[in-house]
């Protein structure tokens, strides 16, 4: 092979390397979704979101008004607006619903009967609210690591989810801070629902 052909071969290889490195373009941006996270005080909303953001649990303080966290996942970023769950704050929840693309409802599966009833009433209100009723819901039955925790089937029956949420996009999942794999899987399922809703909107 002549020196000219060798030089041409090397130049062509350099060109291919240049195309691979410089013309590939940036990776596609992850989609972002705006979510609202609600639930009674003590249900564990702040702790779960902080854990997903790899924040130290030692610094967790219950939310009294609202806070916003960007929770990163491999295929999406969830901008979660967490609302405080105290009695005097819950009546203002609906003021913060506008612009939400999905809902996270956290309940304490080991709570007292009174608190569980209050959580059921709040979830029923959210599922029927005009600004939320068409959105995907992730319902987390938290504190499954506690001895008094109710099972997902017990929660589903007590909350009357089958008749109330019929025709809606919703997921009910058990969770605890001790099982991050299950928690991340729950959010992955929610992201799938959000993507499905996006695709449906594009087709319409």
From Swiss-Prot:
Gene Ontology annotations for the cellular component aspect, listed alphabetically: extracellular exosome
Keywords, in A-Z order: GTP-binding, Nucleotide-binding
Pfam family, one: Arf
GO MF annotation: an example: GTP binding
PROSITE patterns: ARF
Positions bound to GTP: 39-46, 82-86, 142-145
Keyword Coiled coil: no
InterPro entries: ARL15, P-loop_NTPase, Small_GTPase_ARF/SAR
Domain of life: Eukaryota
Family per similarity comment: Belongs to the small GTPase superfamily. Arf family.
UniProt-listed PANTHER family: ADP-RIBOSYLATION FACTOR-LIKE PROTEIN 15
Protein name: ADP-ribosylation factor-like protein 15
């Amino acid at each position: 092979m002549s020196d000219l052909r060798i030089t041409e071969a090397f130049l062509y290889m350099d060109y291919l390397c240049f195309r691979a490195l410089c013309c590939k373009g940036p990776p596609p941006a992850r989609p972002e979704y705006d979510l609202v996270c609600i639930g009674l005080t003590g249900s564990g909303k702040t702790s779960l979101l902080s854990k997903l953001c790899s924040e130290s649990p030692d610094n967790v303080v219950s939310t009294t008004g609202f806070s916003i966290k960007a929770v990163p996942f491999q295929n999406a970023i969830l901008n979660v607006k967490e609302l405080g769950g105290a009695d005097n704050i819950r009546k203002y929840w609906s003021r913060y619903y506008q612009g939400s693309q999905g809902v996270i409802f956290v309940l304490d599966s080991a709570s007292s009967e009174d608190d569980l009833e209050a959580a059921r009433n709040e979830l029923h209100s959210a599922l029927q609210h005009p600004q939320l009723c068409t959105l995907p819901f992730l319902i987390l039955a938290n504190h499954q690591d506690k001895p008094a925790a109710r099972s997902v089937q017990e929660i589903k029956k007590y909350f009357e989810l089958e008749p109330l949420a019929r025709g809606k996009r919703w997921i009910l999942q058990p969770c605890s801070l001790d099982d991050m794999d299950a928690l991340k899987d729950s959010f992955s399922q929610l992201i799938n629902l959000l993507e499905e809703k996006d695709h449906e909107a594009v087709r319409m």
